[in-house]
Amino acid sequence: MSRNVNKANSVLVRYQELQAAETGGYQDFSRLKRPTRINKVTKLDEALRWRNELVKEIGQRVTQIHDPSLNESQITEINDELNKLFQEKGRWDFHIRNKLKGPDLKKRKQLNTTGGTLIDGKRYFGRALELPEVQKLLRESKEQREKERSGKEKKAELQRKIKRWESTLKDDYFVGNNSDELLEYEKKRTGSLRSTIHSSDRDPSFVIPNFDVPSLKDVELWLVQRRKNELKKQLGL
C-alpha cells in the first residue's frame, strides 16, 4: 500500500514541477535528468542551474572515491565517472561562456571540483592514486621529468663551459679578426714584402739566366745517345 502511495506522490510532484515550469515558477533540477544535448539549452539561468547540479555530483563522487571500503574495481569505475563528469563540465563552461555569453566559469575555483592528479591527459582522484597501474604511471612520469631536467642541466653546463672557453681565446683565434694590433702588423708586413719584390730603386734579388730551350728532335737524339752509351758500358766497349 505504501509503495503505491509513494508512486502516486512521485507522479504528483512531477506534475506540479511541470506546471511550475510552464508558468515560470520553481523547478527542482535535482529531480530531472541533465540534458545530453547541451546546445539545446538556450537560457543562461537554466544552463547555470544544470551546471550547478553537475558540480554537486562531482563533489559527491570525489568524496565517495576516498571511501576506504572500496575495492580496486569500484575505485576505477568511480574515477572513470569523474573524468566523464569533468568533460561534461568543460562542455557546459564552454556553452555558457561562448554561446550564451555568460561568465567565464573556468576561472572559478569551487570545492571538490578541482584537483586530482593529471597523468597522460587523465585525472586520478583519491584512492585511484593508490592503484598499481597508476603508481607505475607516476613512477614513469617522475623518471621522465628527471631525465628532461638532467638533459636541460647538462645542456646548460655545456653552454657555461663554452662561454668560459670563449673568454680565454685571444683575438688571433678568430677568422676575420679586426683588432688594431693585428691590422697594424698586417699593414707593416705587406709594405715590407712589396718593397722587397717590386722595388724600383735596386736590382732584383736574383736573375733568371738565358738559355736555349731544346726542341723535340734534340731531346730524342739525346735519349738515343744516352742509350748507346749505356749499352757500350754494359758490353765493356
UniProtKB/Swiss-Prot annotation:
Q: What is this protein called?
A: Pre-mRNA-splicing factor ISY1
Its Gene Ontology cellular component terms are: cytoplasm; spliceosomal complex
Query: Any idea what job this protein has?
Result: Involved in pre-mRNA splicing.
Tell me the organism: Kluyveromyces lactis (strain ATCC 8585 / CBS 2359 / DSM 70799 / NBRC 1267 / NRRL Y-1140 / WM37)
What is one GO biological process annotated to this record? generation of catalytic spliceosome for second transesterification step
Entry keyword set: Cytoplasm, mRNA processing, mRNA splicing, Nucleus, Spliceosome
What is the similarity comment for this entry?
A: Belongs to the ISY1 family.
Pfam families reported in the protein's UniProt record: Isy1
* Compartments where located: Cytoplasm; Nucleus
InterPro entries found in the cross-reference section:
Helix_hairpin_bin_sf, Isy1, Isy1_sf
Q: What is its main location?
A: cytoplasm
Q: Does the keyword Acetylation apply?
A: no
Assembly and interactions? Associated with the spliceosome.
